[in-house]
Structure formats: C-alpha cells, structure tokens
Amino acid sequence: MKRIFILLSCTAALLLGACGKDSSLPAATGKASIRAINAIKTSGEFNFLIEERLIGPAAYAAATASAQYDDLDYTFNIEVFYAGETAFRRIASRFIDFEADKDYTLLVSGTLDNPALTLWVGDTRTFDEADTVFEAKFAHASASLGALDYYFADPTVAPALGDQVATLSFGEVSAATDLEAGDFVLTITTANNPTDVVYVSDTTTIGAQGAYIFIPFEGSAASTAPVLVRAINRIGNSISLPDPRFLPTVQFINASIDLGLSDIYDDELLTSRLVDNQDYLDVSAELEIPAGANTFYYTPSEDTAAVTLETSLTAFSGTRYRLVASGVAGAFSGTSLVPDRRPVATYAKLLPFQVSNNFGFVDIYVVAADTSIDDANPVLFGLAPTQLGAPVRLAAGSFDLYVTEFTQKVALAGPYRIDLALGDVVDMIVVDKADDPAVLDVLFLSGGPTP
C-alpha cells in the first residue's frame, strides 16, 4: 500500500506541475502584421510561411500579402521549388518575437544558395477618417548600388543637397514620415550628388490614408532600365513606378508567309521607316519607341502605295515588347506581347507562342532525349494561334521537343534536341513551314536546339 500511495502522489504532483505550466503560457495582448519582400534577382517565386503554414508567395521585386497574427513568437520560413525535385526546399528561417501594434517587413536578398534576411520593424499605422496624409518609407534593395539619396517632392522642385528625405545603404529602410496627399516625383541619386541620378519617376499622384514603402531593386531581362522601383502598400500590393528616361523597345517578327517581304513604318505618311526588307521569319533588332500609343504600318518592300497591315501598341517606359505579324492575305494581324525572359535559378523556362494558319490548337511535348511521346503527356496542351502560353518550368537535362496537333501523337514539328541548365530560357514560336503546309516549324529566339 505504501508503494501505491507514493506512486499516486508522484502522479498527482506531475499533473499539478503540468497544469501550472499550461497556465503560464504567454497570452496574446494584441496583433502585429508581417510581409516578406523578394529581392533575390535570380529567384522565381518563393513561399513565405509562418511555422509550417503558408502566408503567400512573392515574385522577384514584389511582396507577399500582409498577414496579421497574435503578439507571440514564431519562426518564419522561406521555401522555393526546384524543377525536378519532389518537395519545396527550405532556404532560410527567422525567429521573430512579435510585439503588439508593430508592422514587420522581412527583406529576403542575396542568393538562393546564400540568402540574407533583414528585418524592418515599424509601428502599425492607422488613420482617422479626416486625415489628409499618407505614410512613406524609403528602402534600398539594389545590391549593385552604393549609398543612395532619396528625394520625394513636388514635380516642380529639383533635387538639391540637403532636401533628401533619406540616405540609405543596401538593406536599410528609413523612418516613416507623413506627407500631404498630392503629386510627387521620386528621384534617387548617388549619395551627396544630386546631379548623379540613378532613377527618377514620372509624376505620381498619391492619395491620403495609405502607407507605402518605396524601394529600388536590380533591373531584369524584362526591362530596359537598370533599376526597378516599386511602391509596396500596407497590404503587400506592389505598384511599378517606371523610369521615363528609359524608352520601351519593340522587336518585330514576320510570321506570315503571305505578308511577304515588308517594310515597317511608324508614321501614317510612311516617311519614318523602322525596318526594311523583313522576310518570313526575319527578326528585327530591338528598337526604341516612344512610351504611349504607337501605330505601325507594314507595306510591301520599297512600295508605299498600299498598307498591308496596320497595328497598334501602347507601350510603357522600360518595357521590352515583341510584335509578331501573322495571318493570311486579307486577314493579317499584329500581336504584341512581353515574354517573361528573366532567367531564374530554380528551373529552365519554356516560353511558347504559336501563329500557325494551317493548324488550330497544338500540343507541345518535352520528353527525355530519345524517348517516344506515345506514353507522355504534353507540357502544354491546346495552345491556340496568337496565344502566348504560360511559361513552362523544366528541370535541367537533355530533352526532345515536339509539336503535335491537339490531342494527337503525330509530330508536326520536331524532335528538337534541347540541352537545358537551370536558368536557361527557351523562347520559341510555332510557325507554318514555308514549303510544306502539312507540317509545322519552330522559330527559336533563345535556347534552341543543340547544334
């Protein structure tokens, strides 16, 4: 009986201890918010997690949605997916002890192999209904640039030393400041040199009761500008602020057999010729054009008596466009697009576009080298004419690429042997074969078949 009594006493003590421990767990007293910003130039989207639960994804030069949690402590994780692997790869983690009424931003920079996490902490901003101000912070996420001065003023005010709202090095963020709603121009210069302009925005109208982080990133292959600037609001939306000094460009491609040898003009009087003697499947250089509305006129080569195709493009500063002429006689068309040409380190990227007149929907297969497509599924199915397919993510390796008619297994084009490394971009257009209407061809603009 004595042994039983001692055992029961110990059990009771353990239970009381456990109850005491439960009652001492921290209790939330309020909320805090957090978002992550992707400043890894070579990354695709990463996932941002609280412990093991997804908060949301962030593409390069963008933020995740903001999320709000109790003021307790958490571990936040960054994960990416590498093509060819079966699970997400965790690349970084950060423990944060939340304080109530704080706003946290986690800047993820560096490389995928060696990421750096920088935590910015501020107060959660609230506004009264009658407030006429907005909150502005300025940050630095362009690793190739040194210290920068930030000027944020009325469009009529030129930058002058001493008027900067912030001077920042990479990874830093300014204190929050309240400004009256209105029109502003953001100018970024090298530190202590207001004439050495790194970036300048168009006039931007900012309304009251918003909270923004204005932040420069490294430029990418999708842009003609060396610096990208985003305004990230308090819910995590990223607003692009292009630099008007960097003009958009356009690359012209003739993908219509019937259009024939053509000249391309950018004025209705046909006096300003951009491209001359463009034949079927010719690809022009990337040509600068004005931002805004543009109209292009195609004529037979050296003959301005008739316009064979008139097509328009509304262009934004810094953007690299492509204009593909397609169709048959009497029904020519021009399709403008912005291919996602930015290489990423987690997969090879296939960018498919098709403009066939002889076939409708097509399927695209990418299979291991020397493998039949009979038992394979297409990586992209039902691609319609003049439709830019979603980028296809591929693993590294040696592959054969085929094009077939929709749901069919008979190759209309291919096999094309493509040897891929992570970061490669296969930029391709499915076209009609000039000398055989029964099959198709592929115009590779980058990442084409191995010689």
Label the model's feature ranges:
Residues 19-451:
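Intrinsically disordered, low-complexity polar regions and short flexible loop motifs
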Residues 1-18:
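Sec-dependent bacterial lipoprotein signal peptides
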